[in-house]
Structure formats: structure tokens, C-alpha cells
Amino acid sequence: MDEINKNFCYVENFLTKEELEFFSIYAQMYHRSNENSFDEDQTKLGETMQVYGTATETLLLLKTKKINKILETKVLPTYSYWRMYTKFSQLDKHTDRKSCEITASVNLGGCGTKWPLFIDGKEVNIKPGDAVIYHGVEKLHWREEFQG
């Protein structure tokens, strides 16, 4: 917990190879159906996002024990959110809502283009299957425009 109090905690192999493959395929299939890509302003570029999705809520529950062990404290899972970014997408500078005191940003795969997450101005390149854990309500975080 001390590590994320200072900055953030980078976790290699947060997802198993099988979990990564499953969620990568799931996200691509969901994106192709594009069921909700126009429901929110943030998805105006044809992006796909999902809050409280069955697959990601399952992942959230499965990974809570792992996060508890990493942080050496008990956390309470609140919600899951995933987004498939497309060319020219960006993640505006923000902090998370109060219910997301601790954030785990996980790379579910992609096209291989380097696209860092910035946490309080520090560049973090998250590899597929890896995660970065940080205080989302306290740490300003964002991504610049995606060129991939």
C-alpha cells in the first residue's frame, strides 16, 4: 500500500495468458457489435465502452484477492469499466469518482502501438496483461491522443 500512496504500483502479468486472450477477444467482439458506442459523449469517435459488464465484473471479483495481496490490505470491489480506443481517441485529464478510491488500469491488448497512461505527469507504458494500481480519486491521470 505504501507504494501506491507515493505514486503507483506496476504489476506484471496481472492477467494470465488465458485471461488476456479471453478479454481481448471479448472486447473485439463487443466492439464489432458496437452496441453502445453512441450512448456517451466520450465515445464519439466510434469507441466502445462498457460499465458493469458481465465479463469485466467477473474479472473484478476474480482479481480482488490478488489486489488485496499486492496492496497488503483489503479492498472492496465497486465497479468495472473498459473502453476500446480508436484512432484520435484520448482520455481527458481527470480523477475518478469517490467510489473508485483505488484504480487498477489493465491493458487488455491492442494493436501494439505505444500509448502511455500519465499518472500525475509520470508516463506509464502498460504492457498487455499488466496493470497499474493507483489512487484514482487523488491522482490526475490521462492519455494523449491515440495515433494507432
PLM region descriptions:
Residues L62-K66, Y81, T103:
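Generic beta-strand or strand-like secondary-structure segments
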Residues E144-G148:
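Short, compositionally biased
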